[in-house]
Curated annotation (Swiss-Prot):
Substrate binds at H148, T149, K290, N299, R308. It comes from Bradyrhizobium diazoefficiens (strain JCM 10833 / BCRC 13528 / IAM 13628 / NBRC 14792 / USDA 110). Binds 1 divalent metal cation per subunit. Can use ions such as Zn(2+), Mg(2+) or Co(2+). HAMAP family: PdxA. This is 4-hydroxythreonine-4-phosphate dehydrogenase. Keywords: Cobalt, Cytoplasm, Magnesium, Metal-binding, NAD, NADP, Oxidoreductase, Pyridoxine biosynthesis, Zinc. The keyword Transcription regulation does not apply.
Amino acid sequence: MANHAAKPLALTLGEPAGIGPDITIAGWLRRRELNLPAFYLLGDEALIARRAKTLDKTLGKALGAEIRIASVSAHEAAAAFTEALPVVATGERATAEPGQPDASSAPAALASIRQAVADVRAGRAGAVVTNPIAKSVLYRAGFRHPGHTEFLAELAAKDGRVPQPVMMLWSPRLAVVPVTIHVSLRDALSQLTSELIVSTVRIVATELKSRFGIARPRIAVSGLNPHAGEDGSLGHEEQTIIAPALKTLRNDGIDARGPLPADTMFHEAARSSYDCAVCMYHDQALIPIKTVAFDDAVNVTLGLPFIRTSPDHGTAFDIAGTGKANPASLIAALELASRMAAAKT
């Protein structure tokens, strides 16, 4: 991939018992073949060494390559990357076995995220890339955030002000953003306001320009109700909430189109007419992208003072340690983060 970031990417450990270590190792093994940007893993070197030993019989043998691990500092990571997977210690041990999540390893997962943010804000890394976490495991250890996105926003706070995080799912074929994120459908309906739509779309438009190089972003905005409410016969939110938001956005000079019926927004011809689809709730946005780009979609958090991407899948405990985990989404996340960092203005 061209236009790599000048600095290595900080990759978090994710859930230690999940496939995060697996796809990290699998991605590193393909670094030369795919010309991947340099990255380093923040976590417990002993855990990664154990997983590497397990995977050497499958991944290493299949690719005809030796899995090598190097304990380094963030400053040494880029130089080490060619010959070994750089691992930067966080001071937290992780003892969980593949497929057997243990709340005692939660501090290691959280320390990895905190250190990645600290590294990118200190200029040691070009972007943050996060491996999948298991929120249910973190909750047992006292974690109180709905997800990665909200935790990262808190870590990005400055002078007590927490930025509004916007979750984008991106692929070469489709990019989507849900206005409401990790809440129940009932709560999503109560949270939906014109102000939230306006602030979300403004962030999307700004970052499509600055980090994706799109000079005049075309943003398609969905309705909430079936057939976008059919002029109020199937719901009023399009008229009372979404349309006023679109008027404000257009007055700002933003190309925001809608409200559009969600059931006809995502076929191939429709997708070619916009750069990003903004939807009203989580599943309205995620079902289409996981249908058209299940293996290579990337989770991108917009609205933060740093770049963050993540593979668009979970921990897959059932295949952890087997060598069966597909690293395609992580590879896409690394490549996109590097491209965004190189293009950042």
